[in-house]
Amino acid sequence: MGTRAIVSDANILSGLESNATGVTAFSMPGWQLALWATAYLALVLVAVTGNATVIWIILAHERMRTVTNYFIINLALADLCMAAFNATFNFIYASHNIWYFGRAFCYFQNLFPITAMFVSIYSMTAIAADRYMAIVHPFQPRLSAPSTKAIIAGIWLVALALASPQCFYSTITVDEGATKCVVAWPNDNGGKMLLLYHLVVFVLIYFLPLLVMFGAYSVIGLTLWKRAVPRHQAHGANLRHLQAKKKFVKAMVLVVLTFAICWLPYHLYFILGTFQEDIYYHKFIQQVYLALFWLAMSSTMYNPIIYCCLNHRFRSGFRLAFRCCPWVTPTEEDRLELTHTPSLSRRVNRCHTKETLFMTGDMTHSEATNGQVGSPQDGEPAGPICKAQA
């Protein structure tokens, strides 16, 4: 069976020759290349530095090692690798239209982008599920550390399986003396296999998880925002606990919306290309692709900024991480925020949450007399509370 080269993430630009100039139709002026290189370099530096800092903040401070934050580590790791590998090397390939990096890295370049995207969005989905159980069903058993690690490993394995077809059909070709890294799909009567693959990828790593997260965060929002705190406790630990949960949910909703907005044009671009493949041969397509690819890759750099702006513990962590900078002055409060164990008074106050939820109609009497309440404040280690209550 014959094969034909199909445009994909690693072979988006074909090696068309210009009859007038003798150079590739996708050559660009040096000043334009310099602007794009600056934009991509800034993206990679911000994404790698920000996500590496997020990983350090969680791993270096025991108080930050929660189930939710382990999924955030997984998300940050996928984003860091996406920026360091996919954004960097694919930009060089798309801007020069020559593959410089050999056959082995061609396989990797067609395997890793889909893998990282899957890991990113399903880490967000796992966070949404964890928050849903903690807030909507606070008395159900929470994920243990081994279960969390198993889920993370499962996400990576499924992601690799989903990306494997592109890796399997990857190959190196030489066109007019220029080396290309392409995905050569089997000839399947008009590219039906390619269209099916793109649609499956779109559903599994975009539409379906976004739909699940939309439903989860809608229920979480309704649960939190209808929850009232009795007037005599309106300025106590219960109110702070509720406000912390709301702020964390807002941050994660913003993370999900950012991902959705950044990646939608990129997905639509490839789906459109399966119906009208000739668009890839227009001269302007290089600039369109570089813009859409930059927008998609930029999703890797926004999350650390969101965490820093909307979460006080991550903000303290960033101050500590960049304390060598002259304009950053961490305080003792920042250090205590990440290392200090909550005081006994705060733990006792949190014990009264059961009574508060029962008084506001958020739980039944049987729920108010058994089990634990909710989840710890964002960033605090989960642990038994109220055991001494009689």
Curated annotation (Swiss-Prot):
It is found in: Cell membrane. This is Substance-K receptor. The keyword Methyltransferase does not apply. Disulfide bonds join 106-181. It comes from the Eukaryota. GO terms for cellular component: plasma membrane; sperm flagellum; sperm head; sperm midpiece. A lipid is attached at residue 324 (S-palmitoyl cysteine). Keywords: Cell membrane, Disulfide bond, G-protein coupled receptor, Glycoprotein, Lipoprotein, Membrane, Palmitate, Receptor, Transducer, Transmembrane, Transmembrane helix. The keyword Cell division does not apply. One of its GO terms (molecular function) is substance K receptor activity. Residues 365-390 are annotated as: Disordered. Residues 366-375 have a biased composition (Polar residues). Signal peptide: none annotated. Glycans are attached at residue 19. The chain crosses the membrane at residues 33-56, 70-90, 108-129, 150-170, 197-218, 252-272, 291-310. GO terms for biological process: intestine smooth muscle contraction; negative regulation of luteinizing hormone secretion; operant conditioning; positive regulation of acetylcholine secretion, neurotransmission; positive regulation of flagellated sperm motility; positive regulation of monoatomic ion transport; positive regulation of uterine smooth muscle contraction; positive regulation of vascular permeability. It holds the Pfam family 7tm_1. This is a receptor for the tachykinin neuropeptide substance K (neurokinin A). It is associated with G proteins that activate a phosphatidylinositol-calcium second messenger system. The rank order of affinity of this receptor to tachykinins is: substance K > neuromedin-K > substance P. It is a multi-pass membrane protein. Belongs to the G-protein coupled receptor 1 family.
